[in-house]
Amino acid sequence: MVSIRPSVRHTPAYVPGEQPQTNDFIKLNTNENPYDPPAQVLAAVAAELPKVRLYPDPVSTQLRQAAADLYGVDLNQVLAGNGSDDILNIVVRTFVDPGETVAFLDLTYSLYETIASVHGAKVQKIATDANFDLTGPVICPEAKLIFLASPNPPKGKHLNREFLWQTCAQAEGVVVIDEAYGDFSDEDHWDFLQEFDNVIISRTLSKSYSLAGMRVGLAIAAPALIEEMDKVRDSYNLDRLAQVLGTAALRNQAEFVPLWEKVRHTRTRLMEQLAELDFQVCPSDANFVFAAPRWMAAADLYQALKEKKILVRYFNHPRITDYLRITVGTDGEIDQLLLAIASLKGSLG
């Protein structure tokens, strides 16, 4: 009988959003950017294709330098990962021994719990209020690591800045501020790095930079933390094409800013029109909207939209079974979504 580690055997697998195998779906379920990367970013791949027989730069120097230049930090403050999920894994493996505590909000990115549990860590869930918000700083002195996403899924609202600051000031261990959706928000936390040597900011190029298929993540922190994380990082953890596309994207950030503004504009329209269609709509600082239909069970609406070839996200979690998470797509995609919802609502009489 093959022996499986108990921490693995007893951990439910992470459930990603559905990836349809055909191209006839409107895909609003995994928070991808609806707009293609600019042409000059995609053009960067051409020169690298003949080099794919060669190993990539094992430490992603050009990508890290582009990030350092953009975010105003030194090269030795940046670690590159195979998506921000890789960064989160590296953080747990670097700073937490099995049996030690990892803390995170009771409603947040569910992969935090999966990674911590598989590692054999204890998990401490921090209670949020009825609006899925923090009620004060996270006080968990036993935690070796605290994950805090801002904006925080599934609601999509950024966390209270003062609560975050107090959390970092009081924490005994490392605090990861996960800014996966940061470019769609008016809040950032770069000044935290100047004040606290226990803070890691996690970023991804999957959302705002339209590179979900490339898997590019970044950790930005004090050099001492990055040095230890680099020991844990897998060798050649970022492929050649991902590095060159990620570098080009960061170097051409100005080309993406109008796309972020389009997402924000469409997000506002989606929130307003869902409210008109009798949804309870949560305010959002991300590229998705979290909303509950008052006239139909969310699970039933999810299935009805899927039958119309529109994918949104439903979570079978006790506190949020009334809600759907809807990625902000193009204006045309959102038009079709809203028409489908209006039709379904109208059919109920």
Curated annotation (Swiss-Prot):
* EC number, as in UniProt: 2.6.1.9
Q: What class of enzyme is it?
A: transferase
Q: Which family does it belong to?
A: Belongs to the class-II pyridoxal-phosphate-dependent aminotransferase family. Histidinol-phosphate aminotransferase subfamily.
Annotated keywords: Amino-acid biosynthesis, Aminotransferase, Histidine biosynthesis, Pyridoxal phosphate, Transferase
Q: What is this protein called?
A: Histidinol-phosphate aminotransferase
* Top-level taxon: Bacteria
Q: Where is this region: Disordered?
A: 1-22
Q: CDD domains under this entry?
A: AAT_like
Quaternary data:
Homodimer.
Q: Which residues carry this modification: N6-(pyridoxal phosphate)lysine?
A: 207
Q: What cofactor requirement does the entry state? A: pyridoxal 5'-phosphate
Pfam hit, one: Aminotran_1_2
Q: In which pathway does it act?
A: Amino-acid biosynthesis; L-histidine biosynthesis; L-histidine from 5-phospho-alpha-D-ribose 1-diphosphate: step 7/9
Hydrolase listed as a keyword: no
Reaction equation(s) it catalyzes: L-histidinol phosphate + 2-oxoglutarate = 3-(imidazol-4-yl)-2-oxopropyl phosphate + L-glutamate
The keyword tRNA-binding is assigned to this record:
no
Question: Which PROSITE patterns does this entry report, sorted A to Z?
Answer: AA_TRANSFER_CLASS_2
Q: Return one Gene Ontology term, BP aspect.
A: L-histidine biosynthetic process
**GO MF, one example:** pyridoxal phosphate binding
Q: Which InterPro entries did the record assign? A: Aminotrans_II_pyridoxalP_BS (IPR001917), Aminotransferase_I/II_large (IPR004839), HisP_aminotrans (IPR005861), PyrdxlP-dep_Trfase (IPR015424), PyrdxlP-dep_Trfase_major (IPR015421), PyrdxlP-dep_Trfase_small (IPR015422)
